[in-house]
A protein has these predicted regions:
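Secretory targeting signals
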Residues: 1-7, 11-14, 23, 84-155, ...
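Helix-loop-helix units of permease transmembrane domains in multi-pass membrane transporters
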Residues: 149-185, 376-382, 386
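Aromatic- and glycine-rich beta-strand/loop motifs that create alpha-glucan
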Residues: 355-395
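Residue-level recognition of pore/gate-forming positions within transmembrane alpha-helices
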Residues: 181-182, 270-274, 398-402
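Membrane-proximal extracellular/periplasmic loop immediately following the first transmembrane helix
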Residues: 1-89, 410-427
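Hydrophobic membrane-insertion alpha-helices, especially the h-region
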Residues: 393-407
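Terminal transmembrane helical anchor/hairpin motif
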Residues: 1-2, 8, 18, 207-232, ...
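Residues that define the loop-to-transmembrane-helix transition and helix capping
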Residues: 172, 262-263
Length: 427
């Protein structure tokens, strides 16, 4: 503790010396009064270019923040446990069958696991911090899985479905092979994108020597209640994220299996994904519709936000962490989606009985084609481009995206912010 306090004092002194020098320099005062050649930090600072001088000062300030955090972390963890003991002494929290009581007990127990974690200064944590907050590899993984599943469903459109379905003993084998292909693809695609991004992050920021340091060295993980190294957390994040990609891929495969036309399944997928993105970014966390933001595909793919934040849910004496809830829900969805997809592949027939409604639609379509045959060639070409080739769908999707981003650029204010602004204007 003494060495830490000494280091903090030295860093603060260096920052103060540099800032006094910069202030004197900006006021065109005589800087020689400050720089007499004896200050090592000023000697290094003055030998740098203007750009590197700013980086040098910023680095010192970051070091000061990190030193303060490291020195306060043990006391912070100790205070969590002491607060738990104090809260249980109050009568309103003393009911042993209540969620509040059991949540206090679990919180104290969980953070006792990291009470012995020793933090220390490292070169930098930016490689891991940048990686776990960069979610595009998982979004790209899902997009690639859409293409893979679309390709696996090719027999629905190329006339081979009848041939595939006629092999009675082969349908289950085909379904199981596809199950393994989708699972393996999810693991490999996610690993390729995730670890290539990790390598790029290490190349860009450096800090490979810091990977063995506790992940709690990163200030964003001060409420992470598991003793784990930074490289350990990278693997932990990858495992959870891969599971999420595989589960969503299984759900997507089930959607493709249950739709007789894979293009219909693709359109449904795009529309649903667009709706999920819209709800995640447009619904406020305090809105009555916040459940659509909490239970959302986008939030599911932002795995780090869930597993790195300490939060419990439950009822009565049953208390469980959000990360555990996420894992259980993913496993349940995975099993259901896999069973539906495999069963659908085995059971669904290429042909289905024509209902009365289908026959009526066929008659309407015949009349439509009879009228359409008399149209000019230009109208037929437009019909082929917009309707037959589904160009109108692409146009509508692009239009919706443009309208969304145009509207998203506007500032939105809560009622409390509007009230504060009104008070300010009236005063």
């Amino acid at each position: 503790d003494y060495q830490m306090d000494e280091a903090m004092e030295a860093v603060r002194s260096d920052i103060q010396t540099i800032e006094m020098y910069r202030q004197a320099d900006s006021l065109a005062q005589d800087t020689e009064l400050l720089y007499d050649g004896t200050s090592e930090v000023l000697k290094r600072y003055c030998g740098l270019s203007e750009h590197n001088q700013k980086l040098f000062l910023d680095t010192l300030k970051e070091l000061e923040i990190q030193l303060e955090y490291i020195s306060e972390y043990p006391e912070d963890i100790k205070m969590i446990q002491e607060n738990a003991q104090q809260l249980m002494s109050f009568s309103i929290f003393s009911d042993k069958n209540s969620f509040t009581y059991n949540n206090i007990i679990k919180t104290a127990k969980d953070f006792s696991k990291v009470s012995e974690v020793s933090l220390y200064i490292v070169d930098n944590n930016k490689a891991v911090e940048g990686l776990v907050n960069y979610y595009f590899p998982f979004y790209l993984s899902l997009i690639m899985m859409v293409f893979i599943i679309y390709g696996l469903s090719g027999e629905r459109d190329n006339g081979m479905w009848e041939v595939v379905h006629s092999a009675g003993n082969g349908r289950l084998r085909l379904a199981l092979h596809r199950l393994m292909v989708i699972t393996g693809s999810g693991v490999i695609v996610t690993a390729g994108l995730y670890f290539s991004t990790f390598a790029a992050s290490l190349f860009l920021y450096g800090g490979a020597d810091s990977l063995s340091a506790p992940v709690q060295n990163i200030q964003a993980f001060k409420r992470f209640a598991m003793p784990m190294s930074q490289i350990g957390y990278v693997m932990y994040d990858y495992a959870y994220s891969t599971l999420a990609v595989i589960v969503l891929s299984m759900v997507l495969w089930a959607v493709f299996v249950l739709n007789r036309k894979r293009n219909h399944a693709l359109i449904m997928t795009v529309l649903f994904a667009g709706l999920e993105v819209f709800m995640y970014f447009r619904i406020d966390i305090h809105s009555v519709y916040s459940a659509f933001k909490q239970f959302n595909i986008v939030r599911l793919m932002r795995v780090n936000e869930i597993i790195s934040t300490y939060a419990n849910r439950g009822k009565g004496s049953f208390v469980i962490s959000e990360s555990a809830i996420m894992f259980c829900v993913l496993i349940v969805i995975l099993c259901i989606a896999a069973v539906v997809a495999v069963s659908g592949t085995v059971v669904m027939r290429p042909q289905q009985k024509r209902s009365v409604f289908t026959k009526i639609l066929d008659k309407i379509y015949e009349g439509y084609q009879h009228i359409f045959s008399k149209m000019p060639a230009v109208v037929k070409e437009l019909h082929k481009l917009l309707i037959t080739s589904r160009g109108i769908t692409v146009i509508l999707v692009l239009l919706a995206i443009v309208i969304y981003f145009v509207g998203y650029g506007r500032m939105t204010f809560s009622d409390s912010m509007k009230q504060c602004d009104r008070i300010y204007l009236e005063s």
